[in-house]
Swiss-Prot record:
Protein name according to UniProt: GTPase Era
Chain ranges of the KH type-2 domain: 212-291
InterPro entries reported in the protein's UniProt record: G_ERA_dom (IPR030388), GTP-bd (IPR006073), GTPase_Era-like (IPR005662), KH_dom-like_a/b (IPR015946), KH_dom_type_2 (IPR004044), KH_sf_prok-type (IPR009019), P-loop_NTPase (IPR027417), Small_GTP-bd (IPR005225)
Predominant place of localization: cytoplasm
HAMAP family: GTPase_Era
Taxonomic source organism: Corynebacterium glutamicum (strain ATCC 13032 / DSM 20300 / JCM 1318 / BCRC 11384 / CCUG 27702 / LMG 3730 / NBRC 12168 / NCIMB 10025 / NRRL B-2784 / 534)
Length: 305
């Protein structure tokens, strides 16, 4: 039996999570997949491209598309990210509108909902209250009612905690019921369709973002140059990658005092890269200044945006 052979009544489809930056979309994606495929950080606007995570059940296959948070762009990169998100909305079967339990609904949420409905007016919307373990049950109930009122109609709303796992299976069941009948798109052993270089670059960027403040996190980009067998170490892969920043002062911050910060980035990301490649790794990481790359069309094209 091939992975394309599916039982009667099998459901499948694409679900996109939308919401303001830092509402827990990437953490929720990881919880649903059961493995880390999307990087997470305390800074908003961490996700920079749609990431597909695969959720497998006996009666369904759900392709979760984790997108960058919709925001009012300040750079050409921001504009391109918003366009990529809107393109994603138009191609999915279900939209999960995420609102954190610990923040009141505001103008940003309404702006996003309006943008989603403008781009994809016929796609059903499911309300998802994230971070449900961060507040009392009374506040979760109040947020549930507020989101239901915002969405209107017969829209369902599910509170969920990605960290404790509370209601994760309930959310999967609700999403399954809202998807059409269809085939399996991927084999059961696949958890993402991300290519290896992208996953490695994201692992390095996640380590680099740790502890950064203000605007510096937005100025960090990573490019994997090449992956080759290490000529000096048997059974080891040499991963050569570049961290780009926009100014010389930012480079100094990434390197840190006597290179200590760069050393931590290499140590942390190397552990994730070993898991991705399933092999021991030597990580060669360089830092380069690519001036104002967030607003430079050529630089953005080079970095895949």
């Amino acid at each position: 039996m091939s992975f394309t052979d599916t039982p009667d009544g099998f459901r499948s489809g694409f679900v996109s999570f939308v919401g303001r930056p830092n509402t827990g979309k990437s953490t929720l994606t990881n919880a649903l997949v059961g493995e880390k495929i999307a990087i997470t950080a305390n800074q908003p606007e961490t996700t920079r491209h749609p990431i597909r995570g695969l959720v497998h059940r006996d009666n369904a296959q759900i392709i979760v598309v984790d997108t960058p948070g919709l925001h009012r762009p300040r750079t050409l990169l921001g504009e391109r990210l918003n366009e990529a998100v809107k393109d994603t909305y138009a191609d999915v079967d279900l939209i999960g509108f995420t609102v954190p339990a610990n923040e009141k609904i505001g103008p940003g949420d309404r702006w996003i909902l309006e943008a989603v409905r403008k781009v994809s007016p016929k796609t059903p919307i499911l309300g998802i209250i994230t971070k449900a373990d961060s507040v009392s049950r009374d506040l979760v109930a109040a947020q549930l009612m507020a989101v239901h009122e915002l969405l209107g109609g017969n829209s369902e709303v599910v509170p969920v905690s990605s960290t404790s796992g509370e209601n994760v299976e309930t959310l999967i069941k609700v999403m399954t019921d809202l998807l059409p009948e269809g085939p399996k798109f991927y084999p059961d052993d696949h958890i993402t369709d991300e290519d290896t270089n992208t996953r490695i670059a994201e692992a390095i960027r996640e380590a680099a973002l740790s502890g950064l403040k203000n605007e510096l996190p937005h100025s960090v980009a990573v490019e994997v140059d090449e992956i080759l067998p290490d000529p000096e170490r048997n059974g080891v892969l040499a991963v050569h990658a570049i961290i780009y920043v926009e100014r010389v002062g930012q480079k100094d911050i990434i390197v840190g005092h006597k290179g200590q910060r760069l050393g931590r980035i290499i140590h942390t990301s190397r552990q994730d890269i070993i898991k991705i490649l399933g092999q021991n790794v030597f990580l060669d990481l360089r830092i380069k200044v690519l001036k104002n790359w967030q607003s430079d069309p050529k630089a953005l094209n080079r970095l895949g945006f």
